[in-house]
């Protein structure tokens, strides 16, 4: 039988690196892990509600978190940085930092947030998934959306991409799974640099699940 496994965890330490860098005692591990999830959720919600790009979606590729005793360093990799999120050009980062600190409810720790622009945003599965979700919310046909997403990725010179959408597609009564692929995506090879994301999107017909695998050069 085939075994399902997360492609990022499968390659951790070989071609993928950790998104969180810290050590904790056993009694504090679950607390810090939940805090990491809260920080990522707070950043994503802030970008979606306050900082809209010209493409009408946030474009967060990934969020890396590093912890020290009294300092939390957060680096946001974003595809389409708004001027408010560029350091020294607005109050966006300061407001985001205050929102995260209020959410953590901690006064004895410092928080540093840095922004880094992604050179080729459509090589990142999270940004492509957000683009697909936006099109599905606008009731664009899912096959047309998948082909357009593959075209955008191929313009960024990816070696291969696979997209899968599951749910009540086009409002049909029976849920199903549809997928499309461009290039090669060897999921069984650990040495292949596969980037992956899962992105749920709410539509008027229900929740659709988007999965994207991208083979980097």
UniProtKB/Swiss-Prot annotation:
Keyword entries, A-Z: Chloroplast, Plastid, Ribonucleoprotein, Ribosomal protein, RNA-binding, rRNA-binding
SUPFAM superfamilies cross-referenced by the UniProt entry: Prokaryotic type KH domain (KH-domain type II), Ribosomal protein S3 C-terminal domain
One annotated GO molecular function: rRNA binding
Cellular-component GO terms for this entry: chloroplast; cytosolic small ribosomal subunit
Domain KH type-2 residues, every copy: 47-119
UniProt-listed GO biological process terms: translation
Subcellular location: Plastid, Chloroplast
Pfam families: Ribosomal_S3_C (PF00189)
InterPro entries: KH_dom-like_a/b, KH_dom_type_2, KH_sf_prok-type, Ribosomal_S3_C_sf, Ribosomal_uS3_bac-typ, Ribosomal_uS3_C, Ribosomal_uS3_CS
The keyword Translocase belongs to this UniProt entry's keyword annotation: no
NCBIfam families from the UniProt entry: rpsC_bact
Quaternary context: Part of the 30S ribosomal subunit.
PANTHER family noted in UniProt: 30S/40S RIBOSOMAL PROTEIN S3, SMALL RIBOSOMAL SUBUNIT PROTEIN US3C
Sequence similarity: Belongs to the universal ribosomal protein uS3 family.
Designated name of the protein: Small ribosomal subunit protein uS3c
Provenance organism: Pinus thunbergii (Japanese black pine)
Organism taxonomic ancestry: Eukaryota, Viridiplantae, Streptophyta, Embryophyta, Tracheophyta
Gene that produces this protein: rps3
